[in-house]
Amino acid sequence: MPHQHKGIDKAKILTEALPYIQRFSGKTLVVKYGGNAMTDPELESSFARDIVLLKTVGLNPIVVHGGGPQVDSLLKRLGQVSDRIDGMRVTDEATMEVVEMVLGGSVNKSIVNLINQHGGRAIGLTGKDGNLIRARKLLMEKHDEQGDIKHIDLGLVGEVVGIKTDVLEMFTQSDFIPVIAPLGVDESGNTYNINADLVAGKVAEALGAEKLILLTNISGVLDENKNLLTGLSTQEVDRLIATGVIYGGMIPKVGCALDAVKGGVVSAHIVDGRVPHATLLEIFTDHGVGTLITNRLHAKSEH
């Protein structure tokens, strides 16, 4: 009988997922992969299985990955110092060589290999391939003690100007799963290091994706009592930022999700990547495992 109960439980999970599979079949979703999910073997495996399953049941997943800790590790081994300003890496030419080597090389190919080992057909890209990510230099704005805005030069740190969607559509219309390293190139051929959340958001916007999923090391967006907010409208997010409930390091991540939704992505999800199979749970279950952000005023029912 215990085995029968397990079978019934699995059947219930599948029947709960079915309406979501039908609803999202043929839709594109962009998943930002980073944090603990990239360093824990069990989480790595569950992430790869999630991506392969999404492709198998008819969705078009696109992966954008980070890799800051891996960059830090190689810089340390090489004896190079990399400064940060408000969490942004100051990237000179020597640092950029390491960033490109790690993100476009070892990290990208290890994710491709991971997905392929679990039955997928992943293909690795950087923003330089086919001019996929067109970029320009990012000038960071900060207020000085007098309240005046000053621009800070972060070196070869960029922002996204445009996405060549035809490069990605070539793969999503086939069996391939694109895996993108967040490197961009400008009109002069200069390479830029770009925040992976921002790249994922801009890719999702450009493709008119159904969903943007940001895997993080936290449970999602929390209220003033540190309780998880499972669903938010864009108006509610604006209010929570204005009142200081969303603050610090969460502002850029939530801002990226907010911009994507305002730019045409149907919904954005800030998801706890420490939970095995977090991506599947967020998409294919009634409650999800993170915070959903959508233009609709009643977001909680939209998982």
UniProtKB/Swiss-Prot annotation:
One of its GO terms (biological process) is L-arginine biosynthetic process. It is found in: Cytoplasm. It comes from the Bacteria. It is an enzyme of class 2 (transferase). SUPFAM superfamilies: Carbamate kinase-like. GO terms for molecular function: acetylglutamate kinase activity; ATP binding. Catalyzes the ATP-dependent phosphorylation of N-acetyl-L-glutamate. This is Acetylglutamate kinase. The gene is argB.
